[in-house]
Amino acid sequence: MDVGGDWYDVIETASDRLALVIGDVQGHGVAAAATMGQLRSAVRAFTIGGSTPEQVVRGTNRLLIDLDPGQFASCCYVLLDPTSGRALAARAGHPQPLLRHPDGRAEVLDLAGGVVLGVDPGASYPETELLLEPGAVLALYTDGLVEVPGADIDEGVERLRSALAGARPVPLAE
């Protein structure tokens, strides 16, 4: 069995917001999967406790350093108000999200970010404010989707951006 450290989650908060989370623990196998489970649980606990995106990512960073020194992970955390489309995002060494606008344009976002989790106990993770228009698509992904051996990762990101721009919008009911 092949297991790894990638994870994603959608967490409903008490304030009717949605936390959209994606992360990638270094390595493969049981150790990476175990660390992933701990990080996923930590992110859930910080989120349910009402922490801001920066606090969630900073707290998860500190936890990883304490629990598993030498291990690291990337993470992107977006706290979305689905009614207004407003979101706050924090990023820890994770690939930039993509945004497909309602008119079909797709772009690689330029979110501020900090270092990967597990490296610097004093790291900060600045928040970036986003506004998602009705019909927009926010794409979170791990490097495994866009990495090709021997190729620049930016080429893979561009292929994904192009595919997202060319995708036919489908109502959620379908």
Question: Where are the model-predicted features located?
Answer:
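Active-site-proximal, acidic helix/loop segment immediately C-terminal to a metal-coordinating Asp/Glu
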Residues: H28-G50, V108, P121, P126, ...
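DG-centered beta-turn motif at the end of beta-strands
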Residues: D24, H94, T142-G144
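Residue-level marker for buried hydrophobic side chains located in beta-strands
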Residues: V21, R91, L138-L140
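Catalytic-site or vestigial catalytic-site microsegments of nucleotide-handling domains
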Residues: I22-H28
